[in-house]
Amino acid sequence: MEEKNNSKLKLTTLAMAQIAVSAALLCVLSPLAIPLPIPVPFTLQVLVVIMIALILKPSYAIIAQLIYTVLGIVGLPVFSGGKSGFGTILSPTGGFIIGFIIASFFVSLVKEKLKIKNSVLRYILSSVIVGIPCIYIPGIAMYMIFVKTDLLTAIVTLTSVFILIDLAKCVIASLIAVPVNKALAKIK
């Protein structure tokens, strides 16, 4: 009986470690931003968000995203460009932060429900078909509100700049997630 309890404790400890490392990755990599002529900079956030979603269970993925978001809201400079505060959520880039939370949960959920295991192609498809829309829809909506532009202009502006790069990030995240998941399977 004791062995079973230790196993549960190990899983709980592993889950906490995965969540902590994921939140830390977001906090370290998200502030790195390359400014662009539009109010949304180039970052590695999509890559990290998708990678986390492909590695963690849905509940763990969303917890990691929420930790990152709360840390940014309370004042740690973890959002793109080292920004922080609730005002960042209420800005042209705020919808993307909301989208990261949504995407991390749904990409992970699709991976789990469809029993996608260590298939780069299936990881890419799930992250592109589910993750990108989950990120872009609230991102475009908030951009429209705060930049005061119409839907078509917002879509063209944001997708023309980011879509190919974000698709590449989904591929890279998938390539990273497969060996990480294989290694984690050996630990469990």
Tell me what each language-model feature is.
Residues 76-82, 142-156:
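Interfacial helix-loop-helix junctions of multi-pass membrane proteins
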Residues 2-6, 14, 19-21, 28, ...:
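Short helix-perturbing small/polar motifs within transmembrane alpha-helices
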Residues 20, 24, 28, 51, ...:
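Generic alpha-helical transmembrane segments of integral inner-membrane proteins
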Residues 30-41, 69-103:
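Interfacial aromatic-anchored transmembrane helix boundaries in multi-pass membrane proteins
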Residues 1-20, 153-188:
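Alpha-helical transmembrane segments and their cytosolic interface
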Residues 2-62:
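Hydrophobic transmembrane alpha-helices
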Residues 61-65, 123-124, 154, 170:
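Alpha-helical transmembrane segments and their helix-entry boundary regions
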Residues 30, 34, 107, 111, ...:
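Membrane-water interface at transmembrane helix exits
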